[in-house]
C-alpha cells in the first residue's frame, strides 16, 4: 500500500507526529509536500483546475489544500498506480491500522482496482447515513456505502479511475461549481454519477483537532484551515441555489414531507466511531 501524507515541508511538529504515529504501527509512508499560496499553486490551478483560481470566496489556504490533493492524484496517475492512500498530517490512527495500511491484499480481495471507488477511512464525528454495500468486513470493520455528507479528507483510499474521474470533472467546472475538496468528494454538492464511497466503520483514523473537540479536550496540533472552512461553509449556504425565491417557495410547499424525511434520517443517522 502506498501511503502518502500531505504536509507542509516546514511543518516540523506535524511531521514528527506522523513519524511517531505511523512508526508505532510499522506502517510505511511518504510525505507529499503540501502547496501553499504561491506561484506553484497558481501554475497547478491553471493546469488542473482552472476555475479554482477565480473562486469567489475560497481562501488561498483552502485553494492550496484542494490542489494538494489534486496534484497528488495527478502524480499517482503519472506513476501508473492503481490506487493510493491519502492522509493529512494531523491524523490519528486506530487499533490494528497496520492490517489495513501495511498490506493491500484485503483491498484487492474486496475492490476491483480497475473500477472507480473510494474507501473513506476517517470519521469527523458527524451524524451520517449509510447503506449496505455487500463488501465483506475485514478485521472487525465494515464497508457500508456513504449516503450523506461527511466532511474531511484526512484519510481515504482512492482508485486510479476515481482520481481520473475527479480531475476530469474539476478541470471543466466553472468557479461557482467548485467547493472545498472534501465537499466535492463526500457531499451532494457534486454529482459523482454513482461512484461508490465506502465509509469504514468503525473508522480507522480521525483528525486530532476533531477527536479532541468530540472528547472536550484541547487540541495539540490545531488547524491551519479550520477557521476559513467554517466561514466559507456559511457563505456556501447563503450562495446556494436553495436561497433563490423559487427554491424557498418549493421548500415552503414541501416542508411537511421534508420534516418527515428529516425525522426518518435522524432515526437512521449515527456517528461513525473511531477506534
Curated annotation (Swiss-Prot):
Recorded GO MF terms: glycosyltransferase activity
Pathway of action: Glycan metabolism; lacto-N-neotetraose biosynthesis; Bacterial outer membrane biogenesis; lipooligosaccharide biosynthesis
One record GO biological process: lipopolysaccharide biosynthetic process
Annotated keywords: Glycosyltransferase, Lipopolysaccharide biosynthesis, Transferase
Give EC number(s), comma-separated. 2.-.-.-
What the protein does? Adds the second galactose to the lacto-N-tetraose chain in lipooligosaccharide (LOS).
Q: Family assignment?
A: Belongs to the glycosyltransferase 25 family.
Q: What is this protein's record name?
A: Lacto-N-neotetraose biosynthesis glycosyltransferase LgtB
Organism (species): Neisseria meningitidis serogroup B (strain ATCC BAA-335 / MC58)
Q: What is the lineage of its organism?
A: Bacteria, Pseudomonadati, Pseudomonadota, Betaproteobacteria, Neisseriales
| Gene name as annotated | lgtB
